[in-house]
Amino acid sequence: MKLHILAVGHKMPDWIATGFDEYTKRMPPELRIELREIKPEQRSSGRQADSVMAAERLKIEAALPKNARIVALDERGKDWTTMQLAGALPGWQQDGRDVAFLIGGADGLDPQLKARSDMLLRVSSLTLPHAMVRVLLAEQLYRAWTITQNHPYHRV
């Protein structure tokens, strides 16, 4: 099973890539994290946010792995703890389907994309830069895996 992170945005600062890579290289081969960057749509003065999100939705859908479980990151999603994420991971592995985590652009994710997702998940009640969410998600996936392995990385 692969964990895919589909994120709207490109040309991230080096420190984002460094942080993201730090956690992805720690993951075991059977839970590899793969990042797919989606080029954001141009915002112009006459273009509405719903038009931008719809165009980005098409790009995300084209990049989605077939039959993947879709977890859309959204401020109105379920507010899971790290332990809940760790509890879900073994079931996802047994299911055998890849998991695709979706990170929207500046305007968020298109409502149609959220509606077809298997789950809406909130990363934080705080407003975070989208680039930072990549690093936080990679760290939390690594932490969840270490919990399932009784690895000392996670301390209570």
Swiss-Prot record:
MF terms (GO), sorted A to Z: rRNA (pseudouridine-N3-)-methyltransferase activity
This enzyme's EC code(s): 2.1.1.177
InterPro entries hit by this protein: Alpha/beta_knot_MTases, RlmH-like, tRNA_m1G_MTases_N
UniProt keyword annotation of S-adenosyl-L-methionine present: yes
Chief location: cytoplasm
Protein location: Cytoplasm
Catalyzed reactions per annotation: pseudouridine(1915) in 23S rRNA + S-adenosyl-L-methionine = N(3)-methylpseudouridine(1915) in 23S rRNA + S-adenosyl-L-homocysteine + H(+)
Residue numbers binding S-adenosyl-L-methionine: 73, 104, 123-128
GO terms under cellular component: cytoplasm
Keyword annotations from UniProtKB, A to Z: Cytoplasm, Methyltransferase, rRNA processing, S-adenosyl-L-methionine, Transferase
Signal peptide annotation: none
Transmembrane segment boundaries: none
NCBIfam families the record matches: PRK00103.1-4, tRNA_RlmH_YbeA
Family: Belongs to the RNA methyltransferase RlmH family.
Assembly: Homodimer.
Function: Specifically methylates the pseudouridine at position 1915 (m3Psi1915) in 23S rRNA.
Protein name per UniProt: Ribosomal RNA large subunit methyltransferase H
Provenance organism: Paraburkholderia phytofirmans (strain DSM 17436 / LMG 22146 / PsJN)
Lineage: Bacteria, Pseudomonadati, Pseudomonadota, Betaproteobacteria, Burkholderiales
Gene field: rlmH
